[in-house]
C-alpha cells in the first residue's frame, strides 16, 4: 500500500511539473488554457467568472474563444454637457422622481466619476479625463460641480461655454434652452476635434451610469472594432423606443453584455476621434441648425458605421416616466439613484 501511494505522489508531481511547463509554453506563444474541471484559466491565473480579456491585446469569451484586438484604446475624454437651469428643454414636464434639474446633473457626474475610477484602476495604460462643459447653470450649481470635481482623482476641468461665440454661427430663432443645447454640443465637437485623445464620450447630464459602464464600453469597443474592422459608435443606454418598432437587428457579445445593432440614438454616445474628424461637417450641422429629428446626422452616420446599444442598459436616461426615450427596462432605478447620492 505504501509503495502504491508513493507512486501516485510521484506521478502527481510529474504531472504538476509537466502542467507548469505546458502553461509557461502557452504563455510564451500567446495561447490561453481553460481548465473546465476547475472552471479556471491556468495561463491567466484567473477563474472563469473574472474578466479574461486583456485590454488592448485579446478579447476572450467562453466558449467562443478569443478575438485579437486590432485597435488599442490609449486615451478617453468624457465630455459632459451640463445645464441646471432647464428641467426638460422646451417641455412643461417633470422628470422621474420629480426633483430639481441640478440633482440629476450632480448624480450623473458622480456616476461617471465612479465608473471612470473603476476603469482607470483596471486599465493603467489608458489616460482618462472628464471635461464638464456648462451653459446657463446657476452660480451655486457651478460651485457644487466644482466641489464634486475636486474630489475626483481623474484629470478633470470645468468649462463655461460662452454663448456669444455661437450667435453668428447658429442659424434660426430658438428658445434660450434650445440655443444653449446646440451651442454646448457644438462646443463639445470642437473640443473633441482639438483635444489629444483617440476616444471621445459625449454625455448629456441626465444619464446615471452603472459602475461597470466605462469598463464594458472600452473592452466592447475594442472587440467590435476588431470584428467590424472599422470605427463604430457605442450607446450607454437601452432605450425603450428600440422595442416599439418591429425591426430586424443583430445581437453581438461584448465583454459582459449583449449588444444590439441599432439605427437611431439620442446624443449620448462614444466613438473615436478619427470618426469625428472624418464626419465633422455632418455632425456640425447639429450645432448650426435644428432640424427635426435633431439627431438625423447621427442616424445617417449609422448607415456606414455600426451603432450598438447594450442589453441591459449601462446607463439610464432619467427623463419623464412616460418618455419612450427615457427609463431603460429591467433596471433598478431607485438603487442606481441612491448609489450616486455621494461619491
Residue ranges, per PLM feature:
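The conserved acidic donor/metal-binding loop of glycosyltransferases
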Residues: 205-208
